């Protein structure tokens, strides 16, 4: 996000600029040892003859004034001091795990027949347009389909048809103080990398804080998720939590039971939770994935366990870019849209898509992640990691 942050502890004062450098921060140093920093030049009347230095904060750079020592510390000196306090490089080399380096387990990924796939699509509310227009287009072209501007469909709260929970949220966009960025021209500062695991204490410099799983794309293939489910690495414990419930049970009780199950696995040491609705059948229905993720997010915040775990979603419900962006914004750190991927398989088998299955899935995932970056950039956000938990969508209201 665009920001110029000033800070002080009484002895030192400093400023830091965001990585994009889109928030101006200019400063003067005068011959009577004053430093004046502001977003604009000319906020104070200063005799030009007293100015000994004019400079600006550069993207991602810091400035520190030590009032005790009476000196200005530049970005390079400041970062070198703190970078050498602990062997951060060694900690990362020995603790950071790459998803691409995990072994593929000798297990089969579940597959569905054409009839089973159709039944699941009906259970998760897929429409003809979802499959033949949205999913097919993204798998074929590696990008979202182009459509005319404007939205003439009724908002979900006024629709006479059942709408997915995602439809009750609309995307926000940056205004005035937080300008959007151009994610295409400024691709150099965008990042889709996320880190999965226990968030360490920012105030404690410990090697355990580096025990994380690095994932380059939060939209996971079935193989990616299979690798995570079966990873055997010290410091990581994975637990699968079903987000389905018996059809005669109330949704409220199902959510309460979900919270109880999550509390139990956390007590047993789990720090990666995989919420899955693969158990959907004629007797079991799925908790709406956005409700499960956001409800669990708030529950973990209330119980002060949120930073202890990471949430990964394995769901058949998300298929549009807006669905994924909303899930990431409300608590999920990675998503496996298994039914969307399975729909691609059956499009190929039906000769509606002439492409290798794995290439088509990669193109679909690429289209989704580029769409998410586009949504994030409207809010001035350049990294997917920064998108997590910030609620860049808000509920629609019928007025």
What residue ranges belong to the model's regions?
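Conserved catalytic micro-motifs used in adenylation/nucleotidyl-transfer and phosphoryl/amide-
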Residues: 1-36
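Extended, highly charged accessory segments
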Residues: 16-18, 51, 71-244, 250-257, ...
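Single conserved hydrophobic/aromatic residue that forms the stacking wall/gate
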Residues: 390-399
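Acidic, glycine-rich flexible loop/linker segments
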Residues: 33-36, 40-61, 66-86, 323-328, ...
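Feature captures the catalytic cores and cofactor-binding loops of soluble hydro-lyases/lyases
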Residues: 25-35, 40-41, 46-50, 168, ...
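Glycine-rich phosphate/ribose-binding loops and adjacent secondary-structure elements
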Residues: 1-4, 15, 236-369, 375-378
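Flexible loop/turn segments at secondary-structure boundaries
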Residues: 12-15, 22-25, 43-46, 64, ...
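Flexible, glycine/charged-enriched surface loops at secondary-structure junctions
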Residues: 179-186, 269-275, 375-387
């Amino acid at each position: 996000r665009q920001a110029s942050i000033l800070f002080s502890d009484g002895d030192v004062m400093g400023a830091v600029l965001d990585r994009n450098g889109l928030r101006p921060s200019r400063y003067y140093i005068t011959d009577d040892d004053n430093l004046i920093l502001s977003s604009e030049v000319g906020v104070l009347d200063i005799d030009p003859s007293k100015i000994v230095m004019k400079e600006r904060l550069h993207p991602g750079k810091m400035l520190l004034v030590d009032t005790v020592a009476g000196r200005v510390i530049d970005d390079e000196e400041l970062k070198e001091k703190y970078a050498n306090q602990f062997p951060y490089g060694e900690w990362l080399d020995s603790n950071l795990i790459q998803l691409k380096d995990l072994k593929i387990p000798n297990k089969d990924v579940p597959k569905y027949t054409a009839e089973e796939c159709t039944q699941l699509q009906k259970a998760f509310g897929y429409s003809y347009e979802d499959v033949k227009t949205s999913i097919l287009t993204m798998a074929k072209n590696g990008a979202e389909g182009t459509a005319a501007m404007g939205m003439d469909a009724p908002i979900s709260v006024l629709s006479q048809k059942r709408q997915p929970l995602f439809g009750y949220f609309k995307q926000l966009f940056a205004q005035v103080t937080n300008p959007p960025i151009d994610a295409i021209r400024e691709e150099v500062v965008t990042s889709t990398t996320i880190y999965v695991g226990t968030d360490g204490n920012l105030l404690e410099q410990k090697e355990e804080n580096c025990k994380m799983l690095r994932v380059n794309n939060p939209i996971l293939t079935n193989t990616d998720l299979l690798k995570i489910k079966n990873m055997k690495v010290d410091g990581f414990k994975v637990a699968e939590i079903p987000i389905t419930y018996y059809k005669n049970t109330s949704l409220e009780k199902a959510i309460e039971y979900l919270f109880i199950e999550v509390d139990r696995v956390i007590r047993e040491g789990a720090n990666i939770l995989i919420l899955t609705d693969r158990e959907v059948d004629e007797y079991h229905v799925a908790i709406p994935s956005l409700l499960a993720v956001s409800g669990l997010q708030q529950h973990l915040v209330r119980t002060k366990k949120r930073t202890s775990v990471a949430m990964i979603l394995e769901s058949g419900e998300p298929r549009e870019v807006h669905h994924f962006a909303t899930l990431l914004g409300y608590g999920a750190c990675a998503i496996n849209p298994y039914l969307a991927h399975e729909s691609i398989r059956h499009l190929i088998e039906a000769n509606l898509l002439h492409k290798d299955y794995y290439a088509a899935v990669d193109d679909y995932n690429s289209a989704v992640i580029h769409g998410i970056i586009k949504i994030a950039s409207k809010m001035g956000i350049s990294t997917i990691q920064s998108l997590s938990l910030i609620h860049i969508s808000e509920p629609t209201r019928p007025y």
